[in-house]
Amino acid sequence: MNHTSNELFKAVRYALYAGTTAVVGLSAAPVLAQDDTSSQKLETITVTGSNIRRVDIETSNPVVTIDRAAIEKTGKLTLGDLVQQLPAVTGPNTNPQVNNSGGTGFSSIGLRGLGSSRTLVLINGHRYLSGDPNAIPANMIERIEVLTDGASSVYGSDAIAGVVNFILRSDYQGAEFSADYGISDRDDGASKGYSFTFGQSSDKGSIMAGVNYKKIDGVLAGHREFSKNSVSRLGSTSSPIGTFVGGSSSSPYGHIKIPAGMADLFPGCSSGFLARNPSASGLNVATDYHCYRNNATAEGPSDKYNYATVNLVMTPQERTGLFLNGNYKITDNVEAYLNVLHNKTSAAFQLAPAVFGTPYGAFISKDSYYNPFGVDFAGNTFTARLESLGNRSASSGTSNDQLSTGFKGSFSVWNDQQWNWELGFDYGHVHQSTTTYGLPNMSVLNPGMGPSFYDQTSGQVFCGTGPDDIIDGCTPFNPFNLQDPNTIAALQAAASPGVSNLFSKETVKRLDLNGGLFELPAGTMQLAVGYNYRTEYIHSNVDTGLIVDFNGNCTLGSQCGSALQGGYNVKEAYAELFVPILKDLPFVHALNLTVGDRWSKYNTFGSTNNTKFALEWRPIEDLLLRGTVSKVFRAPTIGDIFGGAASDAPKISRDPCDGYTGGGNPACVNVPTDGSFVNENVRQALQLSAIASGAAFAGFPIGPEKGKSFDFGIVYDPHWLEGLSVSADVWRVYLNENITGIGAQQVIDLCSAGQTAFCPLIRRYPSGPSQGQIQTLIEPTGNLGRVDVGGVDFALNYRLPEFSFGRFNVGLNATYLKNYDLQTAPGLEGNTTYHFAGHFENYGSAQAAACPGAGGGVCLFPRWRAQSSVGWQMGPFDASWAMRYIHRFRMGSASPSQDSHPYGTGNPSLDGLYTDYGSTVYHDIQFGYNLESLNTRFDIGVNNVGDKQPPFLYANNTLNANTDPSDFDLMGRYYWGRVTVKF
């Protein structure tokens, strides 16, 4: 595992290593052989993962550092892209490539595949409310330190998998302007950015300010070969899995269940559904409709709708930011400081036109003039695609403000021990406004699908049962012919944008002290103590047309939610003790122990204590053996507790009630007992209408998740080969009582297994043509599940001796994932263990629904992830090559008992099948030139030089771009350039 290369100012070891980090960028910082520095006093610093100030940069904490030079020499579009490519970051993470469930400009960081909620994001060691790295100006950052170990004893909640700490620049003198531009080799996805930084420093203090601007153009999925079609899998146990161009069953010409008694009109119709003939009016069942074709046949093409083309593989965003960072010495021992950050981001996502139909709140009366079938349509009997409304889209504006201010200083106590103190206040505020377009107002359309008649006198259709019963203010609506001009006009009149707002606020008041207690033979025993009081509050306003009803629907379609309001406060105190035990003995060059504890008391669930024990042993000066054992926890968030109802559209792979003949299965209430029942959502891979909610809404208790983190490593910095550092760390994280959204498949399985608390969450149609089908289902948030994840980190950095043709630096960082095991409901009937390591789990599978952070989406956990780089510098010229490696993986079969296919038992010919994918390697190159006479630097580069395309992942019409946008590059070869001028 990597270790930090922090700034030690004039320290010799840092000076020797600076050349390596400037080109390689990612460092597991070695402790290099030193010259005689006895006359120098090395300044102490605080390393991410500890509150103790020390001279040593190599401690028990495994930290990887991305320095400023690496940030400046990358052509990555966002800071989030840069951090997400670290080998320790895996699993589902949001970024601008994520369209469905993304599109806000936000990037998340999830270390160890445990999800972003278990990785804490800091700025200068303090909590960062929004957690969005993209909102931090790149010209504001000195370095990024990533701790890959549990740190709840130091930072409190969320620091389970580790910490990402953005360290800001300070004491800057001068001015700097930078401009950059990039574009793909397909002439799309253009990006441009500008930044200006100014700073002044003196003996009394410093001030630094800057502004920045970045714009990234969106890219349509139809502009990439791998994403232009929605794709499904097919195959059998005796033949390889292949693909066909599929799509959504909800087409512009309808997906209409054949009513009982009309099957004879369509003999041999295996799908059981109809679609209108494109040129027909839809008023005559026998002549205007045909059997819905799930695939192309001799009778005609597939009726499925290719929704993929208009989706995005890069969501557009535009951001403007400014920052101020200053400090002032009030006295020799007291300093005031202020850090202010403001960012405004505009972003958007785009999806195919809205799906309309009876599962989403529509009801079509048998007495409608336009209904030729003579039966009511409700339940899962009718859907269609509203192309005339245009694409569904949402634009968001996010304002992110962060302030940190206070006083800090130092004083001496007994035996001339130096102590440092800090009294501070942190404030964070986020406001996000989202406007949604392309959704129909069902409160306007539904009356028009009630009884209606054709008036012979006027030649018009009116709402009502006859001339004497005309309903005023009602416009008849024809759902069976969405291309009719009158229908289009009615739809467009019924469409209206929905506006929602979210406000969140965090305040922290803190006091920190650290310093020496007394001298021991091996060094100074040190203590760090502190106290803080933190409050968090969230409030949201949801457009009335988007407020969800009990069926998961709303008047503006199916993308529905509800208001959220809630907050909590927490009081915390910590102590950390550093004990130098032995020093300068045979086989004990140094032996140090660190013990820490943090007490946290929440007004929502109570208190928790989390401890840490860390040991550092240097048998010789060049070799460090280190180990850490920590208790970790995550408190339930405001959303976990108070989150209201929000519509969801999950898929399920099985229904235990298929073929039900009685027997009292509690999951099968209202299901017919004649053995004929087949769940249509499973059989046709249709999405359910569901409601996801916080614990309070569903009546579920919730508390913190708890666990342990282990890290044992070795770092070798041989004095006989100056510039070389190698390290390896074995790590493991156990978590119990996971805070999770309990997905639809889990709710059904647990109820069927006798866990009756989940049964009231399932609501099936009690009668009619959809009897027994799931009408709606509540997916609550609660404590359920256990995670065991472990692996090994490796790092190598080597600064070669300088040659006549320049200086070279090489680096390698890699993570091996040994195991990733998740139990869905330990100790309960219905528990399933998923083995995620080396697997990709696709949307709609029970495995993906349980994947941390995926929200029912996709999750990939390759066994190996790695980065390597080679840097060269000679005079004013420099160049670098970087490689990123993602190991081969298998889609499906995360355990022998699981099907690999989201259709589950509804498509038994595909059960147990899997697909193997090869490894993926990306190459980036960069060239730089310093024109010193003009104080100007030029950088050009190419990302993904080989134009490596992402693996084609077949996830049955529901996956973003037919691949995994969290892990793979969707843009292809990308050219970029940057000019930086210093004044």
What do these predicted regions represent?
Residues 83-124:
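Extracytoplasmic beta-strand/coil segments of soluble accessory domains associated
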Residues 648, 810-930, 947:
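C-terminal beta-barrel architecture of Gram-negative outer-membrane proteins
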Residues 736, 818-819, 882-900, 928-983:
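C-terminal beta-signal and adjacent terminal beta-strands/loops
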